[in-house]
């Protein structure tokens, strides 16, 4: 009797919609993403990282922020690279900050020059003024175009006399 019940339960589980859903999602997870899917995933990860960075709807958690920003950056998200660079400067890892900022710039995010200026200033290289100007211009353009992710950084730039 117990064997029959076990067989019925096993058959029900195999035929259940949940068992088909999990295997289908496993298959689709392995499938390559289209450029649009990649962009949407990168945006979602960036927003999640930004949320953890600034505590918009979640408790601030820099470790999780960096995790999600890094995942977005790995998908080619230039804004995520900027904020990773900023976090690396704050943690004192100037080499990593430079790599992130350079990658952001390569992807077209000229705000990365603002980070390069901060690095230059900390390393006493003396070329920070032009970088700050270019970075500030990019920050201001981003905010003027409606990207409020950069408004806090722009505010600090104004506060410290960069703009």
Predicted segments with their positions:
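N-terminal leader/linker segments that initiate helical-solenoid repeat arrays
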Residues: 5-59, 63
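Short, charge-rich amphipathic alpha-helical segments embedded
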Residues: 71-79, 83
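Short helix-capping/linker turns of helical repeat alpha-solenoids
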Residues: 33, 40-41, 45, 54-56, ...
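Structural signature of tandem alpha-helical TPR/SEL1-like repeats
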Residues: 59-67, 90-100, 125-138
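Alpha-helix N-cap/N′ positions at the starts of helices
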Residues: 37-44, 48, 64, 80, ...
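Canonical positions in the second alpha-helix
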Residues: 71-72, 103-104, 141-142
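Gram-negative bacterial Sec-dependent N-terminal signal peptides
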Residues: 1-3
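Hydrophobic face of amphipathic alpha-helices that form TPR/SEL1-like repeat modules
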Residues: 47-54, 83-90, 113-123, 151-160
